[in-house]
Design a protein with these regions (language model features):
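N-terminal hydrophobic targeting/anchoring segments and the immediately downstream early-domain regions
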Residues: 2-179, 183-193
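Second-shell residues forming the walls of enzyme active-site clefts
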Residues: 104, 123-125, 129, 156-173, ...
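Hydrophobic faces of well-ordered beta-strands that scaffold small-molecule active sites
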Residues: 110-117, 143-147, 177-183, 235-239, ...
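Non-catalytic positions within long, well-ordered alpha-helices that form the structural scaffold/packing
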Residues: 138, 229-230, 323, 399
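Substrate-binding cleft of extracellular glycoside hydrolase catalytic domains
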Residues: 171, 177-221
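Active-site-proximal loop/short-helix segments
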Residues: 191-197, 234-254, 281, 285-302, ...
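A substrate-binding/cap region within the structured catalytic cores of diverse enzymes
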Residues: 201-272, 276
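Mid-to-C-terminal alpha-helical segments outside catalytic/metal-binding sites
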Residues: 424-446
Length: 446
């Protein structure tokens, strides 16, 4: 009751104040509005300052990225890196014949080259794929890229780099590239045994061969194929199919499966099966066999003194059986076989060794391997080649010999221009180029 009376006694004074002070009310409203406007102006100015600071930060970040990823624009590369399945829906895949008809001579010649990302982009060390990579692929859509340890830093980095790179090839040419690595397992490994990849090392292949269990070779190929496919590769320069026929050989002693041709074939074939089960094209190397040499073709002249009969009975067996088992590539080595060819020409440059014997020419059926897949040279920047041939000469001679792909010429631009000029002046026929491109596309469109 008392509280109610107090409340009632307050009403009249308030009523009186409202009645006699309308001007004061308007004044209050004006003051509130002015304050709100001031706050708004201050807030907008604050937002503008923040945006300017964010812009400065972005510019600074881009400068840092440009420093650590020379030649690559990461913002451009951040565009959708994975190939969109939706983009491919409704499109009829090209046949090999259709692709060949649509390709220019320049495009066909470029398909014959496999180079490092550094040779393609001109960047000193490549470990990312962005605007510079895309620009280089648009200008020089080569057949493939081979990566080495310095390019491979972590699983996520490799996946991102390869996914973007392959997308640039698809977007610019409609044809995927061979993305390769030299991952034999054991002595030669770019990925396994490295802490950052979390993949255990493999035993040397000589140890695998000595086990007498070809299944172990399959397990090597299967495991390597699994993680290479996961990272984005589609090609591996493995297995070593060299038979260790010279006990003094140290080049492939730990990398070879053994001293017997049939045993080496059995083990190398299992690696091929393991790799290719995961979509990784295998490369049998190094025809006619590095196991019979003493010198290393990386450094200079290397030769085997074995006769054709001896080679056919032992050294050639893994290549013959590997081809029959479906190996998509055979690598030709820079190894001379004077007892076969009559001179010191490296096998990779010899029409007799590549076209007549490895590929097979009518009339040589009894002493030929009849290989129908892709023949790729060993690296053309090796001493056995550079000591005797220019980049252009080596590339042209390798194609004349019967190789389909040219790996890592010492000077890519010179080699490419040399092949193009050779076709234009008739030294090489376009039909010869078409034969190799057809073999390449058959594997890519497989």
């Amino acid at each position: 009751m008392e509280e109610r009376q107090r409340g009632q006694s307050r009403r009249n004074p308030k009523s009186r104040r409202r009645q006699r002070g309308p001007a004061a009310g308007w004044l209050v409203l004006l003051l509130v509005a002015a304050a709100a406007a001031a706050v708004s102006v201050f807030f907008l100015r604050h937002l503008k300052v923040q945006e300017e600071e964010r812009a400065k930060t972005r510019d600074s970040s881009e400068a840092v990225v440009a420093e650590y990823f020379p030649g690559d624009d990461r913002n451009e590369a951040a565009k959708d890196s994975a190939a969109s399945e939706e983009e491919l829906e409704g499109k009829t895949p090209m046949t090999v014949e259709e692709a060949l008809q649509e390709m220019t001579l320049r495009e066909k010649v470029l398909q014959l080259f496999m180079v490092t990302p550094e040779a393609l982009t001109g960047v000193d060390e490549v470990y990312a794929a962005g605007a510079k990579t895309e620009e280089s692929i648009r200008e020089y859509p080569v057949g493939g890229i081979v990566y080495f340890k310095q390019n491979l830093r972590s699983p996520d980095q490799v996946k991102d780099m390869l996914t973007r790179t392959q997308k640039y090839f698809r977007d610019n040419t409609g044809i995927e590239a061979f993305l390769a690595v030299d991952e034999e397992g054991g002595q030669v490994s770019r990925i396994s045994g490295r802490e950052e990849f979390g993949i255990a090392s493999f035993p040397d292949m000589s140890e695998i061969g000595a086990s007498g269990e070809p299944q172990k070779a399959y397990e090597v190929g299967d495991k390597i194929g699994t993680y290479l496919a996961d990272l984005g590769f589609n090609m591996d320069f493995a297995p070593v199919a060299d038979v260790l026929t010279n006990p003094e050989n140290t080049v492939v002693a730990r990398r070879s499966f053994g001293t017997d041709g049939a045993v080496t074939a059995a083990f190398s074939n299992e690696v091929v099966k393991g790799l290719q089960a995961h979509g990784i094209s295998a490369v049998l190397k190094h025809f006619p066999g590095h196991g019979g040499t003493t010198a290393d073709s990386h450094d200079g002249y290397a030769a085997t003194e074995r006769t054709l009969e001896e080679l056919m009975a032992e050294d050639f067996v893994p290549f013959l059986e590997g081809g029959r088992a479906g190996a998509r590539f055979i690598m030709s080595g820079h190894i001379a076989a004077p007892a076969v060819t009559g001179d010191n020409t490296p096998a990779s440059m010899s029409p007799k060794m590549i076209t007549e014997i490895l590929r097979g020419t009518p009339g040589y059926e009894l002493k030929t391997l009849g290989y129908g897949g892709i023949i790729i040279t060993d690296a053309l920047n090796m001493g056995a080649v550079t000591s005797s041939y220019s980049s252009a000469d080596a590339a042209v001679r390798a194609l004349q010999a019967g190789n389909d792909m040219l790996l890592m010429p010492e000077n890519f631009q010179e080699a490419y221009q040399g092949v193009l000029t050779a076709v234009e002046n008739g030294t090489l026929s376009e039909e010869r180029i078409n034969q190799s491109v057809e073999r390449i596309l058959k594997v890519k469109f497989h």
